[in-house]
Structures are given as structure tokens and as C-alpha cells.
A protein has these predicted regions:
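Short, charge-patterned binding micro-sites
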Residues: 23-27
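Conserved hydrophobic residues forming the short capping helix/wall of the S-adenosyl-L-methionine
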Residues: 12, 46, 186
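Conserved alpha-helical substructure of the radical SAM core
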Residues: 1-22, 37
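Binuclear metal-ion centers of metallo-dependent hydrolases, dominated by the metallo-beta-lactamase
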Residues: 175-197
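Conserved AdoMet/S-adenosylmethionine-binding subsite of the radical SAM
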Residues: 30-160, 165-172
């Protein structure tokens, strides 16, 4: 907390205030046992030093079963949650959740609890892992994902593709054409969507 106070004070003194304060980093921020308290403290600091800045939370959605995490995320301006597919086998192969009880249906149900105060972030790609195809731009992945988005009714959807080298060299970017086609289908449901290539 002290480091954040010093940084915000320095920025305020320089007249260079941040646009956004983001909870992210090395690991899952919502897994911190005091995440809710950290959000509250950050809101107070934001209000004091940079009241125009927005608070964003980037999460893999694995801690949404904890009510205190959901309540804290309701307080941030941009509650950004990952949902790369609705296929459990795909998630186990690609995302490799640490929790063996992880189920995408549970995550979708928890995302619906935000009542629209959520931004869904999804990465589309091509390639293979351990000899298995992990391209998720095919209709068998996109159609059920779109149905989940319809059920969740997020404020916005952000779709993107691989941006930097991955641990597995067999992974490749989805094309702008594919991302734009998916983006249009989200927008056709009346939900704002951005695509990053």
C-alpha cells in the first residue's frame, strides 16, 4: 500500500495522473486472501489521488465462487473476466486450471451473477498442444461460446489472439477475418465487442 501511495502522490505532484489502475500481475489477483480489502483500499486511494481514474480487474474467473470476490469486483469499473471457450476438455488442455473441480458451466453461472457488470475477454487461436487441435475459431466452439455470452449479458466483450511468444511453439494467431466475423456475431446480439489482432 505504501508503494502505491508514494507512486500516486508522485504522479499527482507531477500532474500526470493515471487513466486506469489495474489489478493483474503474476498470478490470479482475486486469489489473494485479502483481495476485497485491497479493492476497498485502492478505491479510497484512487478517490484521493486520481478520482478520474478507472479501476480494472483482470481475472481468469476461477475465484468467482467466493462471494467476497464477486462483491469486490462489483466495485471496480472494469470487471474483466476470461472465458476462452465453454468446452471443459479444451479448458483442461489449454488453460489447465489448478482446481480439478473446475467446470465451465459453474463459471458461466457465476458470471451471470454480475447482472451485466462484467466484460468478457476471450482469446481465439489456432494450433495444437500434445498433438491435439486447440483452434477455437471453428463453429463447434464459437456457437456455444456465443450462447454463453448471450446468457451472461456482459457490458462488453473483448476478443483477441496471441500477442507474444507462447510456451508452446505450435500455437498461432487467429486471423483478423476470423476475429471480425466473431465480433460481428457478438454485436448482432446487441453487445459491444472489440477485436484486437
Amino acid at each position: 500500500r505504501g508503494a502505491l501511495v508514494r507512486q500516486l502522490q508522485t504522479m499527482a505532484d507531477d500532474g500526470s495522473r493515471p487513466d486506469v489502475l489495474t489489478f493483474a500481475g503474476n498470478g490470479e489477483p482475486t486469489a489473494h486472501p485479502h483481495f476485497a480489502e485491497i479493492v476497498d483500499a485502492s478505491i479510497a486511494l484512487r478517490n484521493r489521488y486520481c478520482p478520474d481514474a478507472r479501476l480494472s480487474g483482470l481475472s481468469n474467473a476461477t475465484q468467482l465462487h467466493r462471494a467476497e470476490v464477486r462483491e469486490a469486483l462489483m466495485k471496480v469499473d472494469n470487471n474483466i473476466q476470461k472465458l476462452d471457450t465453454v468446452d471443459d476438455a479444451y479448458i483442461r488442455l489449454v488453460n489447465r486450471p489448478a482446481n480439478p473441480a473446475y467446470r465451465v458451466d459453474d463459471i458461466i453461472g457465476q458470471l451471470r451473477l454480475f447482472g451485466g457488470h462484467v466484460i468478457i475477454q476471450t482469446m481465439f487461436m489456432h494450433g495444437s498442444i500434445d498433438g491435439e487441435d486447440v483452434g477455437n475459431t471453428a463453429e463447434r466452439y464459437v456457437a456455444p461460446w456465443l450462447e454463453a455470452v448471450r446468457l451472461i449479458q456482459p457490458a462488453e466483450v473483448m476478443i483477441y489472439t496471441i500477442d507474444r511468444p507462447t510456451p508452446d511453439t505450435c500455437l498461432q494467431k487467429a486471423t483478423p477475418l476470423e476475429l471480425d466475423a466473431i465480433r460481428r456475431r457478438v454485436e448482432d446480439m446487441g453487445i459491444a465487442c472489440t477485436a484486437s489482432y
